[in-house]
Amino acid sequence: MLLDRYLLSRFLGIFLNVSFVSVLLVSLYALLDFLVGFKEKRTDVALSYFLNILPLGFYYISFITLSISLILFLRKVFEKKMELTVQSFGISPLRFSLPVLLFSVFLSSTFLLGNEYAFPKLLGNLWFIEKNYKKKQEVKGFIKNFWFIKKENEVKTYYHVGNLNLSDGSLFNFYTMKVERKNLNPLEVLKVFSGVWKDKEIFIRSGEIYDFEKGKREKVFNKTFKLGLSIKEVELFSEKIDFLSLSEIFFLMQKSKKVGLNVDVYTGELFYRVMFSLSPVFISIFSLYLFFKHKVLSQVIPRFLVFIVILWLVILSPKILPQKANQPVLYSLIPIFLLILYSLKGVYDLRKGFRV
């Protein structure tokens, strides 16, 4: 349809211009951060830093980029009264908006693929660069709810540090899960309820060990366990949960449930990534709904800003509740469910149309 191509080209033009400005701002921030904050200003470090931060910057500010693009695009459409002309031919607002909605679905699909294949690796690279080349990156204080992974030969080990005092090494709620790298079969799970971490060993005051190869479970009291990992290496050379792909998070979610580990952190991270990736669809539906219902920019903007704040809180809730507030991730499902219902209602209203 000729109108579809026209609307899509106009919207893409605005979106690309806004994205260019956004990436330019991210580049400026990265340049200033590199010049001021890095202790080593080598060309290879700068290039690696820019190549990792730019795509991540586009991903994280797409929330704002898409919102601005939609408002600018729809303002022009409604100023020209194009929606009235189209509706006079019996074309619904949903059909009229189809090019924009399909683009938002494409953007969400790209973000989901990025969370599986690209963004976690870029975050890990960025973390490593900052920890090694930025100023004042010494490890100190406390580590709480820290998740990471270490790969060695044929074994991959997932770690969770519940609470670690770096000054004396006192440790609470520490878990490790060893799995085979090829088929991800679990080999061993270590649970340390309380202990002391010194050098590359942990003195376990109270804990448990599950040996999957022998099918054996053993209580551990006042015993030293060789970990092969020092406290300094935890932050300098490890991977956090943010650096795991969607498939790895899903795997850990399943395995953690089977062996009795805290599954809420993985479930919350999975929901957060999926919801953030789907945010372009939610933003597009709601902005189209508001413009077709109210038509006047002065009435649309306040409602749109309120929606953006609510959407942001809903998206963050599955990540924050288990990781920061120690609350069940199920609490976040209620606002997510309501958001999905409200979005479906918006699609229905767009399909039905609004009285002029």
UniProtKB/Swiss-Prot annotation:
The chain crosses the membrane at residues 7-29, 49-71, 91-113, 270-292, 299-316, 329-348. It is found in: Cell membrane. GO terms for cellular component: ATP-binding cassette (ABC) transporter complex. One of its GO terms (biological process) is lipopolysaccharide transport. The keyword Membrane applies. The keyword Amino-acid biosynthesis does not apply. It is a multi-pass membrane protein. InterPro entries: LptG/LptF_permease (IPR005495). Keywords: Cell membrane, Membrane, Transmembrane, Transmembrane helix. PANTHER family: SLR0882 PROTEIN-RELATED, YJGP_YJGQ FAMILY PERMEASE. This is Uncharacterized protein aq_359. It comes from Aquifex aeolicus (strain VF5).
